[in-house]
Swiss-Prot record:
Keywords, comma-separated and alphabetical: Cytokinin biosynthesis, Hydrolase
Organism of origin: Arabidopsis thaliana (Mouse-ear cress)
Gene name for this UniProt entry: LOG6
Domain of life: Eukaryota
Kinase among keywords: no
Protein's recorded name: Probable cytokinin riboside 5'-monophosphate phosphoribohydrolase LOG6
Amino acid sequence: MENEEGKREMTKKQSSRFKSICVFCGSSNGNKASYQDAAIDLAKELVMRKIDLVYGGGSIGLMGLVSQAVHDGGRHVIGVIPKLLMLQELTGETVGEVKEVADMHQRKAVMAKHSDAFITLPGGYGTLEELLEVITWAQLGIHDKPVGLLNVDGYYDALLLFIDKAVEEGFILPTARHIIVSAPTARELFIKLEEYVPQHK
């Protein structure tokens, strides 16, 4: 009986409402090993839950770590990269399917089209821009896909405080604050994303 319950629980853990998830992250590794560990942990969760990866197409930094680990785990990987970044963000062999696009705007549109949800790891300006755009799209009703923030070692604490301040000052509606789902680990984040229901409509 206990074995049957265990099997059911394992099946439940491995199934997901998402078929593919777009991951935004840095083309650098960051200065802490915890950022790289978080990227690998996220990849393992995607593989365990049988979720395919859509990402920015780079083979360096956290992007490279996530894509390689998901590909090695047997899941489909779609990398979307603008022509102008091909030399900067690609080194050696690429993994999975690479979609070359004209520019950054098309990159985000294609990534969103092929994804059921978004997860953001630590990153810089480009990562923030991608995150804020999909949050804005959700607020405008362009999509109702969950937006997850993997807040590794409090990396995004200041951003979340800023957003809370914007709510407090009347620039963001309280219901729109709930567009962002955050957690410190991939496993905790997935639990929240699986249960996510939009509140901002």
